[in-house]
């Protein structure tokens, strides 16, 4: 830095005449030569400044020097080492100086340069020059330099005599002067204070030397300097480039243009610099001409280049300005303080401080410039050689006619005809003579005005490449040459700064970029560009971009302040930290001084594209009318979708819009003259860009922009692509830092570490605070971004879009209102923080519009708005903002190679959207156009060299180890590998979106509302892994249909609260990665949905409408290439699917606790596989309206509290879905594992079936409407079977030995025919035949017809259908089903109906009792009045007890007294049970909100609660389920096929009054010893659907069941009858039903039904007899009089045809099987009665004793063996029956004794179990009562049969007998021992007697009880030892 010369800050006034100081002539000549050498000696050839080489007329003041050669080495020393710029040659044709002798003080000093030529070269410096620690010369004050020069001249150039003579002459001249020329402190004046200090009578002070006087004289002369430079030419040669940049300046003039004027502020001086004819050309490079061979010069220095040689760029005016600034100084700044004057200065110090000291000293041998000095001296001593060199120079500089003319350059830049004028006005305040002003108040004021005309620039593609290459070289070399910075120097003395005001005015600035590569070959290119540069309005006939800037005004103001390094009153001490002092002083300066400021105003800025044929398209345009085009919506997001504005839109590429700039500006909204006139635009007038910044402080630059419109036409990018492709290879990132530079210690560039610096750094503020300094603040009212994409080519093979004028999709507008952008300064010194904010953008609202081609108005479909406060709240709206930060990314690469990761944080408080179908369609077209445009525009078939190397190691070539190693070696040199990462985080508080979906019937639009809260989007790129990750999370959402009545479709199940810590409703993660070695692109998509409810309402057409709404139009997205591998993962947790029936008020909800699905889709795959795993899947239902949902820990509890009842649950479900992507698209679903559980009551199951039926009706109303006509007559036999006629045959069939398998003589099948498909049978094959089947016996022998079996008709061609493609195949491999039937009722409506009916019956009974008491007699109608049946299942009324009168005769014929007693007993029981306490149901139980938290009576009926029982009464279990379901396409005759098999089927009895365990199970073995085959299926069903017509379908059913074993307890049987006969009352529909929905849909039609024989073995235990049913003629009720054990029957093979409905099918089977059993199998049934069964078994043994010897004799004649077999059978059967009978008698005796003990001992005995209970003794309800004694109560204890837990062997029987006997004997002994004590304790007369009486029966009965039990256990153990198979059956029978 140089101090401002004093002559620039002095007054302008008429200088007085020069004092007559007479200087000797020799001194004048020597002084002139000395001054020239002193100033120019280092920069030009030194010999040219000798006196004999200078043409001068000293008397006239004229000096001229020609042909000066600039010293390149000295100039290069001043170029910073990091700058790769070097001066190769420089010449000055003529240097002229004119001194105005003798009027030196009044006339100007003129200096002129003619033809200045500088050649610079931009090239990479050598490593030696990089490592050279070249430092720039230190700062020197110009005042000190001038003083030092004068001192050197006096003390070194002159001898003592000449010096004394000069000093005396100067002193004498000053004393004799009558006027003080320095009284007003004029330039060059002496700082002598007031005028009185120097007078003619007083000599000069002793401390005033003549050196100061001479320096003042020089300064006063230079104050009148006029400088002129003409014909300046600066050339820049770029290494490896063919063109040369040539800057030409016609003239530079510097002169004083001030007039003598004085005002109140002081006197001013005005100086001006005028620069004319500035131009920049690009000229072709030319070879250097051969130079003169001079051995000595060539060996000592590089050859001098000619004027046309290549050069490097630099600022050619820097040194000229420096030359002027060095000319004059303010002498007051060089005055020495008294302390400095008193101390003699060291001469050596003076020389070292002089900036020209090196020019006076001799060069050192060791320095590089030493040889140059020797060379120069050698040439100057040889005049002949010097003359030859000068002749050669003149010959090279002056062209001859024979020389080839220089190639003409192409003009690039021109400043026009106007000059660049710089005016500087300096004003210094007047100093009064009466007082001394302070040093700081006497500040000069400088005003600088720079005026520039029109600047025009035209860049061709080659020119752009040239400049980019130069910039790349500069950037790369500047980053490489990171030379350590010098240490902070000690602060210099305080110096005042001027008050400076600088203003720059630029009239216009035009930049035209020609992007057409063929323009450079045009013949008239030079003339065209010259014409345009001369007049910018002249068009350029080549396609180009034109940038225009009008009226730029820049102003800089500095108030002038002192910025000292430390306070003036403080002197640094050795122990004081300099940094600490600097910090204190700077803070003081900021507090007390006003900062400087910079202001820039731009009138207008625009960027246009000029195409051929007069086509003009805007690119950037400032349009003040944009913000008045529409009014911003003010409604907050929660107020709906109202408030979306509209604005006019137009395509700027239309032909009719190719006018001036006004054609693309927004016209004011038309109001017309009669409507009040147009909107005033005065507020919009002014600069489009206004910049203001306060310098010297931490304030940022504030940039205010008017409304800005940016037009983005993608076709423009395509037109620019050839230019960009030619430029892109030149743009490359910087190379890694060299190792020699990395080795430099980091502390070398910092200051020295001392204890003081450490303490100072500790007290310094943290570096993060410095890193947060704001750099710029940009504000704009509105920024509009308009994007259009040209229509794609009609043919995909075409690779050109054209001019891009055609438009297919539309235009997208993005309006950003109230934009505020703040950019931070992160390039501050000190330790940088780990993360620093770079920029922050904030805006009020952003609207995104879309307009199709045919639309003239655009409507916004997306608005980013602030989060406005709720009404009534006072709060500042939260504005949307975008923050940009950077931080170093974690990497294993070296520190020099780690790039920073950019973090973009977007906070969007609210988003509003209104999406219509035309908008979606247009956006899809737009996206497709952009995608196809990218494919066309950036399609490049040529592979890069690096890409070819990557392909060698890819999966296409095998990828060997060697290729991998080579790839790893080349990896660090790949520029793309070390890339900066990016993270984008978007936070959205609220989203309010409206979807307007057209209906399928074209009746209007369906409106959907989508709302979401707390939405977060995060995108992150990992450059090292070449991976991009995207995450999306939504905490709360609501998707509803608001077309009419709002219907919620999707949303969070329970309200979102901060305390519940719930997971997001939607979480999406998308990861895309590419393997660079294999070029495999992989996409991973993970979707997690949780805590949501998806509702399916009456209409599901909206699904098709949304699918049609989002469906891309035809021809869109057809050219997208899929990724190589796509992985999709879906996870559902705590999900609910609500199914709302179309016509009923209830609903079903499906709960999903955890579901996980995964699939992989490779590129080109023929099928896709989806694997799903589920756990905790459940189904709940509610009859009416549900209550509110509350937060709970368990999802099922949430719905149960709202009134839902649990119906089904899936514990585990694993499935695999495979779908073919080609051909017919076959779908295969494999369920590998499934566990189902159904829990229901009678009413909830009926409701579920009714709701499911309602769903079925709504899905297809015309299903099964058309049925085939069936001929039905009363005499038609629908049974394709024969009844038996030969009873002898039946007897023979029952006599078949059990050693032979039972065989069906008709089919030839036996039990061995039960094979599974895995054992060799083909799927769908059936083998028939069961023992005991009713058949017809033929009289004669059967003759088999050959080929008969092959010719049988096939009902189902399974094999052919199985091979047909295009079907949907569902296969269940392993599943289990458990159905739990509960007692009680789930719906409050059912319970209320029962309670109301009970009260009604009670009232009727009370009325009847009154009538009977009044003497009236009962009739037959009383029976109907005293009973009622609800829901076809529940009986309420008088008990049908076993008395003769009530049960057999009926109520109408019984005695009035008995009837009165029965009524009284019934009413007493009802009062006892209904008068219970009140209880509060659990929260949420009920049909609606009114049912929640209501008090109900603890209602009981017959001791049973009406609510669902805690435990199930009946459990139905199916395990080992395998199912195959095939659905065939419509063109097939077979529509579907279902094959169902179950390995096990059981019905468990959990009723507490029942002692039997399994109601139904498999038969272990029949009477003939046949057992079940291994792995045989217990249940097998096949259902085939046959398609007759398009809408007609019939079913074919075949079923086969293994032999069954039944243990039927009457309580369980009655429960099942009541449960499945329950018919819920029709639910009142809350919705109006259409006429066609009220009609019942026909049931299924079975074309063919085949049921194979079913063998049964029954144990039945009756408990009640329904005499009413007997009176009605139901003979089946007779079974309740007998116990059945082992009763066998066979339900014969039946084949039916033409059956409609399942109910009719069941009724038909019952009507067919029952008569058959009665007619043909009654004997087998009766033989199962308990007493008869024993006789039958014994009789069977007797028959074997007689018949087996006979049979054996007939067979082989060995009668002994037959007798042995018969005897064994007789003995075994007889012994077993005897033991069984004895055990029963012993058990019965035990029960009688226990009852007697209870009666006599005063204690209630144990329940009598194991015996047939007679008549029920319940208080209320009889026969068919749901809650009578037949079903257990929650309070009852579970009954255990005495036949349960039988001993397995004789040994265990004896042990059990001993244990029982000892227990009872001990009890009797304890009773006897306790009697005396009880007698002693009792007092009174009868107390002891009662104790003895009560103890005696116990003492007697206990041993008897133990004895009977011991006998029973022993006999049972013996029986089980003889018959182990019976023991296994008992385990299944008893609990």
Curated annotation (Swiss-Prot):
Pfam family, one: ATG2_CAD
Membrane topology value: Peripheral membrane protein
Cellular localization per UniProt: Preautophagosomal structure membrane; Endoplasmic reticulum membrane
Keywords of the record: Autophagy, Endoplasmic reticulum, Lipid transport, Membrane, Protein transport, Transport
Chain spans, region Disordered: 286-319, 360-412
Molecular function terms, GO-annotated: phosphatidylinositol-3-phosphate binding; protein-membrane adaptor activity
Record InterPro entries: ATG2 (IPR026849)
Coiled coil regions, renumbered to chain: none
Low complexity biased stretches: 303-315
Domain Chorein N-terminal: 30-121
GO cellular component: endoplasmic reticulum membrane; phagophore; phagophore assembly site membrane
GO biological process per UniProt: autophagosome assembly; autophagy of mitochondrion; glycophagy; lipid transport; piecemeal microautophagy of the nucleus; protein transport; reticulophagy
Record's keyword annotation contains Nucleotidyltransferase: no
Record's catalysed reaction(s): a 1,2-diacyl-sn-glycero-3-phosphocholine(in) = a 1,2-diacyl-sn-glycero-3-phosphocholine(out); a 1,2-diacyl-sn-glycero-3-phospho-L-serine(in) = a 1,2-diacyl-sn-glycero-3-phospho-L-serine(out); a 1,2-diacyl-sn-glycero-3-phosphoethanolamine(in) = a 1,2-diacyl-sn-glycero-3-phosphoethanolamine(out)
Protein name: Autophagy-related protein 2
Domain of life: Eukaryota
The family this protein is said to belong to: Belongs to the ATG2 family.
Compositional bias of kind Polar residues: 397-406
Known function: Lipid transfer protein required for autophagosome completion and peroxisome degradation. Tethers the edge of the isolation membrane (IM) to the endoplasmic reticulum (ER) and mediates direct lipid transfer from ER to IM for IM expansion. ATG2 binds to the ER exit site (ERES), which is the membrane source for autophagosome formation, using basic residues in its N-terminal region (NR) and to the expanding edge of the IM through its C-terminal region. The latter binding is assisted by an ATG18-PtdIns3P interaction.
């Amino acid at each position: 830095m140089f101090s401002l010369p004093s002559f620039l800050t002095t007054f302008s006034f008429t200088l007085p005449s020069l004092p007559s100081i007479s200087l000797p002539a020799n001194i004048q000549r020597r002084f002139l030569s000395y001054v020239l050498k002193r100033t120019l000696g280092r920069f030009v050839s030194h010999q040219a400044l000798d006196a004999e080489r200078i043409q001068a007329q000293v008397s006239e003041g004229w000096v001229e020097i020609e042909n000066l050669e600039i010293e390149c080495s000295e100039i290069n020393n001043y170029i910073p080492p990091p700058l790769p710029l070097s001066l190769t040659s420089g010449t000055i044709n003529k240097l002229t100086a004119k001194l105005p002798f003798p009027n030196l003080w009044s006339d100007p000093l003129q200096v002129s340069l003619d033809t200045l030529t500088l050649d610079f070269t931009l090239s990479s410096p050598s490593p030696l020059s990089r490592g050279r620690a070249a430092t720039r010369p230190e700062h020197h004050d110009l005042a000190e330099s001038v003083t030092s020069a004068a001192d050197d001249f006096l003390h070194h150039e002159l001898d003592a005599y000449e010096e004394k003579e000069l000093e005396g002459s100067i002193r004498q001249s000053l004393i004799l002067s009558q006027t003080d020329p320095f009284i007003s402190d004029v330039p060059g004046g002496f700082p002598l204070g007031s005028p009185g200090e120097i007078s003619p009578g007083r000599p000069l002070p002793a401390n005033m030397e003549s050196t100061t006087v001479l320096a003042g004289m020089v300064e006063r002369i230079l104050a009148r300097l006029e400088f002129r430079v003409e014909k300046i030419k600066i050339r820049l040669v770029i290494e490896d480039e063919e063109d040369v940049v040539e800057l030409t300046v016609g003239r530079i003039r510097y002169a004083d243009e001030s007039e003598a004027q004085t005002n109140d502020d002081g006197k001013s001086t005005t100086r001006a610099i005028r620069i004319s004819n500035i131009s920049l050309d690009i000229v072709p490079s030319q070879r250097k001409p051969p130079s003169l061979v001079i051995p000595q010069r060539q060996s000592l220095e590089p050859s001098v280049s000619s004027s046309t040689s290549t050069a490097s760029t630099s600022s050619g005016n820097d040194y000229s300005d420096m030359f002027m600034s060095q000319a004059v100084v303010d002498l007051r700044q060089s005055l020495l303080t008294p302390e400095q004057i008193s101390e003699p200065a060291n001469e050596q110090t003076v020389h070292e401080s002089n900036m020209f000291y090196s020019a006076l000293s001799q060069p050192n041998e060791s320095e590089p410039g030493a040889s140059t000095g020797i060379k120069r001296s050698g040439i100057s001593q040889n005049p002949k050689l010097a003359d030859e060199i000068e002749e050669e120079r003149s010959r090279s500089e002056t062209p001859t006619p024979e020389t080839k003319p220089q190639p003409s350059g192409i003009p690039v830049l021109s400043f026009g005809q106007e000059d660049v004028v710089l005016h500087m006005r300096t004003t210094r305040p007047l100093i009064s003579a009466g007082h001394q002003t302070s040093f700081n108040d006497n500040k000069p004021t400088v005003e600088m005005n720079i005026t520039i005309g029109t600047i025009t620039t035209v860049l061709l593609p080659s020119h752009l490449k040239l400049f980019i290459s130069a910039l790349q070289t500069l950037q790369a070399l500047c980053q490489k040459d990171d030379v350590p910075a010098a240490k902070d120097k000690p602060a210099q003395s305080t110096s005042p700064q001027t008050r400076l005001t600088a203003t720059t005015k630029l009239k216009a600035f035009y930049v035209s970029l020609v992007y057409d590569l063929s323009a450079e070959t045009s013949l008239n290119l030079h003339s065209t560009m010259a014409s345009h540069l001369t007049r910018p309005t002249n068009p350029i006939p080549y396609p180009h971009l034109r940038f225009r800037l009008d009226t730029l005004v820049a102003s800089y103001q500095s108030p002038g302040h002192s910025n000292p390094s430390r306070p003036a009153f403080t002197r640094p001490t050795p122990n004081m930290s300099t940094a600490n002092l600097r910090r204190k002083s700077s803070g003081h300066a900021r507090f007390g001084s006003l900062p400087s400021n910079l202001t820039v105003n731009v009138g207008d800025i625009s960027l246009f594209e000029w195409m051929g044929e007069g086509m003009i398209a805007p690119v950037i345009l400032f349009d003040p009318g944009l913000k008045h085009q529409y009014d911003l919506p003010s409604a907050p997001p929660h107020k709906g979708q109202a408030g979306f504005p509209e604005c006019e839109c137009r395509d700027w590429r239309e032909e009719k819009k190719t006018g001036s700039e006004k054609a693309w500006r927004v016209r004011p909204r038309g109001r017309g003259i009669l409507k009040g006139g147009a909107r005033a635009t005065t507020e919009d007038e002014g600069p489009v860009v206004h910049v203001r910044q306060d310098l010297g402080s931490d304030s940022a630059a504030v940039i205010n922009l008017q409304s800005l419109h940016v037009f983005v036409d993608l076709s423009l990018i395509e037109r620019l692509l050839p230019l960009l492709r030619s430029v892109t290879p030149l743009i490359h990132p910087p190379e890694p830092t060299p190792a020699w530079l990395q080795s430099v210690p980091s502390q070398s560039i910092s200051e020295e570490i001392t204890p003081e610096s450490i303490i100072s750094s500790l007290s310094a503020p943290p570096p993060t605070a410095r890193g947060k300094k704001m750099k710029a603040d940009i504000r704009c009212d509105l920024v509009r971004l308009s994007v259009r994409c040209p229509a794609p080519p009609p043919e995909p093979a075409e690779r050109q879009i054209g001019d891009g004028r055609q438009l297919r999709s539309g235009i997208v507008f993005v309006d950003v209102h109230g934009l505020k952008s703040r950019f931070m300064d992160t390039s501050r010194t000190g330790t940088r923080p780990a993360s620093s904010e770079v920029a922050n953008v904030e805006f009020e609202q952003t609207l995104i519009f879309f307009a199709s081609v045919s639309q003239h108005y655009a409507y916004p479909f997306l608005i980013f708005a602030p989060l406005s406060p709720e009404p009534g709240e006072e709060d500042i709206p939260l504005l949307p903002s975008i923050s940009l930060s950077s931080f170093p990314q974690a990497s294993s690469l070296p520190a020099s190679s780690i790039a920073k990761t950019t973090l973009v944080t977007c906070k969007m408080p609210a988003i509003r959207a209104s999406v219509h179908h035309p908008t979606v369609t247009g956006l899809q077209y737009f996206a497709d156009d952009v995608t196809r445009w990218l494919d066309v525009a950036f399609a490049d078939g040529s592979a890069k060299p690096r890409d070819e190397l990557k392909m060698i190691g890819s999966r296409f070539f095998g990828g060997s180890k060697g290729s991998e190693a080579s790839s790893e070696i080349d990896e660090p040199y790949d520029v793309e590998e070390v890339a900066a990462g990016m993270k984008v985080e978007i936070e959205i508080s609220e989203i309010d979106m409206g979807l307007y979906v057209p209906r399928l019937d074209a009746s209007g639009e369906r409106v959907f509302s989508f709302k979401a809260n707390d939405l977060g989007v995060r995108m992150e790129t990992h450059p090292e892994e070449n991976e991009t990750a995207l995450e999306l999370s939504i905490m709360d959402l609501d998707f509803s249909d608001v077309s009419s009545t709002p219907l919620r479709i999707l949303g969070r199940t329970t309200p979102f609260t901060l305390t519940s810590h719930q997971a997001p409703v939607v979480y999406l993660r998308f990861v895309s990665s590419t393997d660079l070695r294999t070029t495999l692109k992989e996409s991973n998509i993970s979707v997690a949905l949780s805590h949501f409810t998806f509702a399916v309402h009456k209409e599901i057409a909206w699904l098709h409408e949304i699918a049609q709404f989002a469906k891309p139009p035809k021809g869109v997205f057809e050219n997208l290439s899929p990724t190589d591998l796509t992985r999709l993962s879906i996870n559902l947790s705590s999900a609910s699917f609500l199914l709302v029936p179309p016509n009923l008020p209830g609903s079903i909800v499906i709960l999903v606790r955890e579901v996980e699905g995964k699939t992989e889709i490779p590129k080109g795959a023929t099928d896709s596989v989806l694997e799903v795993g589920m756990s905790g899947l459940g189904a709940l239902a509610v009859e009416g309206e549900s209550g509110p949902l509350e937060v709970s820990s368990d999802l099922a509890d949430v719905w149960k509290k709202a009134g839902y009842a649990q119906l089904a649950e899936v514990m585990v479900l694993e499935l695999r879905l495979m779908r073919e992507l080609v051909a017919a698209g076959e779908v295969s679903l494999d369920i590998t594992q499934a566990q189902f559980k159904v829990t229901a009551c009678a009413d909830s199951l009926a409701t579920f079936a009714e709701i499911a039926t309602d769903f079925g009706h709504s899905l297809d109303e015309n299903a099964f409407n058309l049925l085939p006509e069936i001929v039905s007559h009363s005499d038609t036999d629908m049974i394709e079977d024969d009844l038996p006629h030969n009873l002898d045959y039946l007897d023979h069939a029952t006599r078949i030995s059990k050693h032979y398998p039972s065989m069906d003589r008709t089919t030839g099948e036996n039990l061995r025919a039960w094979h599974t498909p895995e054992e060799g049978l083909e799927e769908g094959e059936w083998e028939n035949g069961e023992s005991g089947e009713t058949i017809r016996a033929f009289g004669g022998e059967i003759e088999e017809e050959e080929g008969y079996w092959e010719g049988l008709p096939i009902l189902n061609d399974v094999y052919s259908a199985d091979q047909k493609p295009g079907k949907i195949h569902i296969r269940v491999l392993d599943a289990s089903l458990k159905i739990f039937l509960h007692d009680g009722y789930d719906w409050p409506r059912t319970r209320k109906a029962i309670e109301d009916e009970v009260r009604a019956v009670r009232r009727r009974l009370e009325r009847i009792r009154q009538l009977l008491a009044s003497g009236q007699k009962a009739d037959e109608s009383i029976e109907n009045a005293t009973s009622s049946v609800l829901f076809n299942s529940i009986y309420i009324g008088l008990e049908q007890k076993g008395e003769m009168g009530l049960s057999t005769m009926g109520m109408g014929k019984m005695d009035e007294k008995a009837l009165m007693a029965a009524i009284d007993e019934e009413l007493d029981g009802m009062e006892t049970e209904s008068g219970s306490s009140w209880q509060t149901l659990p929260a949420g139980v009920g049909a609606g909100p009114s049912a929640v938290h209501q008090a109900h009576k603890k209602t009981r009926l017959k001791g049973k609660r009406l609510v669902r029982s805690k435990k199930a009464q009946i459990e139905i279990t199916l395990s080992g389920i395998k199912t195959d379901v095939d659905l065939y396409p419509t063109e097939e005759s077979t529509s579907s096929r279902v094959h169902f098999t179950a390995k096990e089927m059981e019905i468990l009895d959990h009723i507490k009054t029942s002692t039997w365990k399994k109601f139904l199970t498999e038969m272990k073995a029949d009477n003939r010893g046949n057992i079940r085959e291994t792995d045989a299926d217990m249940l097998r069903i096949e259902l085939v659907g046959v398609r007759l017509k398009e809408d007609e379908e019939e079913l074919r059913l075949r079923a086969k069941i293994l032999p069954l074993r039944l243990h039927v307890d009457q309580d369980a049987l009655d429960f099942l009858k009541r449960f499945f006969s329950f018919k819920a009352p029709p639910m009142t529909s809350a919705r109006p039903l259409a006429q066609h929905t009220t009609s019942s849909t026909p049931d299924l039609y079975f074309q063919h039904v085949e049921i194979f024989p079913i063998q049964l073995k029954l144990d039945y235990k009756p408990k009640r007899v329904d005499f009413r049913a007997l009176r009605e003629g139901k003979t089946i009720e007779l079974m309740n009089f007998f116990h059945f054990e082992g009763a066998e029957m066979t339900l014969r093979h039946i084949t039916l045809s033409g059956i409609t409905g399942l109910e009719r099918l069941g009724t038909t089977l019952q009507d067919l099987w029952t008569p058959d059993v009665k007619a043909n199998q009654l004997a087998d049934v009766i033989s199962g009665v308990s007493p008869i069964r024993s006789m039958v078994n014994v009789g069977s043994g007797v028959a074997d004793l007689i018949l087996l010897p006979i049979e054996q004799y007939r067979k082989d004649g060995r009668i002994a063996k037959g007798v042995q077999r018969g005897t064994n059978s007789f003995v075994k059967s007889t012994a077993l029956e005897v033991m069984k009978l004895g055990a029963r008698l012993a058990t019965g005796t035990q029960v009688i004794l226990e009852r007697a003990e209870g009666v006599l001992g005063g204690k209630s005995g144990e329940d009598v179990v194991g015996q047939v209970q007679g008549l029920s003794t319940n208080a209320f309800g009889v026969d068919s009562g749901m809650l009578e004694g037949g079903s257990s109560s929650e309070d009852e204890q579970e009954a255990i049969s005495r036949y349960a837990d039988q001993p397995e062997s004789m040994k265990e029987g004896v042990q059990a007998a001993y244990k029982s006997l000892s227990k009872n004997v001990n009890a009797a002994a304890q009773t006897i021992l306790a009697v005396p004590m009880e007698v002693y304790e009792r007092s009174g007369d009868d107390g002891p007697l009662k104790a003895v009486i009560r103890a005696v029966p116990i003492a007697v009965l206990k041993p008897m009880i133990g004895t009977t039990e011991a006998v029973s256990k022993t006999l049972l153990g013996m029986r089980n030892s003889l018959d182990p198979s019976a023991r296994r059956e008992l385990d299944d029978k008893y609990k």
